[in-house]
C-alpha cells in the first residue's frame, strides 16, 4: 500500500501549480528585510503576487523594480482602506485569492517578517505534493517567535501559510486567517485558521524579526507595538529581546549558522537598506 501511495504521489510531482501571495504596506520604513523575504520565497512558487496597500515610504517603487527583475513577481495595488491593520491584510488577501490566484493548485502566503529556509525548499515542495495526493487542504506549521536562534526558550504556535486553493476559502476576521466559508474559526495565538483536513507539518517557518537577536537593525519593539497591540505579554518579550545583545569576545557580531546567507549582509547595520547586489543575483 505504501509503495502505491509513493507511486501515486510521485505521479503528481512537477504538475502542481503554486501561487504565492504577499501583502505589504510601508515595510521599508518599518525596517523589514522584505526584499530578502520575497527572494527566498520565489523558488517555491510559480508566481508571487505582491500587493502594496498604498505605501508612502518607497516600498512600491522597490517592488516595481523587483517585478522587472524577477518574472515570477507580479505587483498589485489593493489599497488598505480599513482602520485595523489585521483587517487590511485580510482585505488584500481576500482580493488576491478571489481575483489573482484562480487556477493555481496551492497557495503560499509570505509576509515581510517571515521566510522559508532555502535548505527546506525540497522538503516543503515534497510535503505539498504528498498533502495534495493524500487529500489534505493545508499544512499547519510550527512558527518560532520572540527569542530566535540564540535563545531556544521560544514561544511557538502552529498556523497556516500553505493551503490548497479553493473558491470556498476566505481570509477574514482576525488577521491573515484562512478558513472555509461557513466554518467556525479555530483561533491559536492571535491568528485563526480552519481548513480541515489539515496536515500536521514539522517544517519550521521563521520570523525575520527574530533572525538577528544581537543586531540593532531589526527593531523588535517596533514590530510588537505595530503588529501585536493589546498583546502585552508578547510586547514585553520583544522589549526584552531588543535589550539583549550577543557578541563574540572580540566584539564582532556572531552570525548563527542557521541564518540563510542572503541575510548575512544585513548583520551590523543600524538601518535596513535595500542592497543593490541583490538585483544582480
What residue ranges belong to the model's regions?
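Short, well-formed alpha-helical segments that are part of the catalytic scaffolds
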Residues: 27-44
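Non-catalytic membrane-proximal stalk/linker segments that position and tether the catalytic domains
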Residues: 1-13
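Hydrophobic targeting segments
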Residues: 16-22, 41, 46-51
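Short beta-strand/loop segment that forms part of the nucleotide-sugar
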Residues: 46-54, 76-80
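Active-site acidic Asp-centered loop
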Residues: 53, 110-111
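Active-site-proximal specificity loops/subdomain of glycosyltransferases
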Residues: 12, 18-21, 25, 58-109
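Catalytic-site signature of metal-activated, phosphate-bearing donor transferases
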Residues: 8, 87-94, 115-281
Amino acid at each position: 500500500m505504501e509503495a502505491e501511495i509513493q507511486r501515486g504521489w510521485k505521479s503528481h510531482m512537477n504538475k502542481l501549480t503554486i501561487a504565492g501571495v504577499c501583502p505589504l504596506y510601508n515595510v521599508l520604513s518599518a525596517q523589514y528585510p522584505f526584499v530578502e523575504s520575497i527572494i527566498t520565497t520565489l523558488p517555491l512558487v510559480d508566481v508571487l503576487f505582491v500587493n502594496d496597500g498604498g505605501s508612502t515610504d518607497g516600498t512600491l517603487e522597490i517592488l516595481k523594480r523587483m517585478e522587472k527583475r524577477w518574472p515570477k513577481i507580479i505587483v498589485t495595488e489593493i489599497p488598505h482602506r480599513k482602520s485595523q491593520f489585521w483587517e487590511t491584510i485580510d482585505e488584500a488577501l481576500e482580493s488576491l485569492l478571489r481575483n489573482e490566484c484562480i487556477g493555481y493548485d496551492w497557495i503560499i502566503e509570505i509576509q515581510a517578517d517571515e521566510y522559508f529556509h532555502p535548505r527546506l525548499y525540497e522538503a516543503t515542495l515534497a510535503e505539498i505534493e504528498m498533502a495534495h495526493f493524500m487529500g489534505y487542504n493545508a499544512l499547519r506549521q510550527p512558527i518560532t517567535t520572540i527569542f530566535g536562534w540564540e535563545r531556544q526558550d521560544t514561544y511557538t504556535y502552529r498556523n497556516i501559510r500553505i493551503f490548497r486553493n479553493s473558491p470556498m476559502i476566505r481570509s477574514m476576521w482576525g488577521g491573515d486567517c484562512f478558513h472555509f466559508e461557513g466554518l467556525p474559526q479555530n483561533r491559536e495565538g492571535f491568528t485563526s485558521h480552519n481548513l480541515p483536513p489539515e496536515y500536521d507539518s514539522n517544517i519550521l517557518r521563521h520570523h525575520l524579526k527574530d533572525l538577528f537577536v544581537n543586531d540593532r537593525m531589526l527593531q523588535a519593539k517596533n514590530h510588537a507595538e505595530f503588529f501585536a497591540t493589546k498583546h502585552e505579554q508578547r510586547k514585553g518579550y520583544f522589549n526584552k529581546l531588543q535589550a539583549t545583545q550577543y557578541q563574540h569576545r572580540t566584539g564582532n557580531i556572531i552570525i548563527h549558522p542557521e541564518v540563510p546567507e542572503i541575510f548575512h549582509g544585513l548583520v551590523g547595520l543600524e538601518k535596513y537598506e535595500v542592497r543593490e547586489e541583490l538585483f544582480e543575483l
